[in-house]
Amino acid sequence: MSEITYNLKYAMLSLLAVIVAITLTNCTPKTNIPLRIGSNLWTGYETLYLARDLGYYNDQPIRLVDYPSGTEEVRAYRNKEIEGAGLSIDQALVLGATQENIRIIAIMDVSNGGDVILGKPEFADMKALKGKRVGVESSALGAFFIARALEKNDMTAKDIQIVSLELTEHERAYKEGKVDAVVTFGPARSKLLAAGAKLLFDSSQIPGEIVDTLAVSTEAIANSPETIQRVFEKLSEAFKEDMNHADIEKSLRSFR
């Protein structure tokens, strides 16, 4: 995480802290049920797990739940399997269009190169994808990212063949030749780059446009305000730990 990215995240988190504190002051806890928060394998959400492993949540009924991608988190939230979720801002907004009970309480990450489009080694640039098969997750983020990448390269969706893929299918589909390129992130990104895939586009070319958030239900805010406040406050402390200790990144990779 660069110093600029960290400072941006910390500033946004501090601003939201004031808003959340004011909101929660007016809430009276009604229950003490566990707060289930979903997340996926993305660096920005690891701070939740770091805070847990540092013991920051020991006195609170907080349960962290892993999902392969934000798409599964959205599904789980709609099915009432979780009360909170780590979601890209577009996913949170799309979910909010049909689920009026969801609120963003924190900015978790601003993507600066983590979201990528990877292609065959022989592809020189994005324009080499004309007429090619490009794997994309069927999500608002996937659609937004490929659209912006095409726009930045004077291309449109008509120039490529979109192949719908779940995140868990990205690596295999590329290696088996089912697609010529893939829009991906996280472990799949690292593995495909290690296997020789060519980086054609990444989120650093559209700075500030891909933001990851922590969103929770209004019921959770009303029923467990102290728990929500605890999550929020300790995220700030975990961010500081992340910056102050060189071995934190290795620890993050090991506990998931």
Q: Where are the regions that the model predicts?
A:
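Sec-dependent N-terminal signal peptides
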Residues: 13-19
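C-terminal motif of bacterial Sec signal peptides marking the signal peptidase cleavage site
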Residues: 23-26
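Bacterial N-terminal signal peptides that target proteins for export
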Residues: 2-13
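Short, glycine-/small- and polar/acidic-enriched structural segments
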Residues: 30-156, 161-164, 180-186, 198-202, ...
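Pocket-lining segment of extracytoplasmic ligand-binding domains
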Residues: 91, 162-163, 168-255
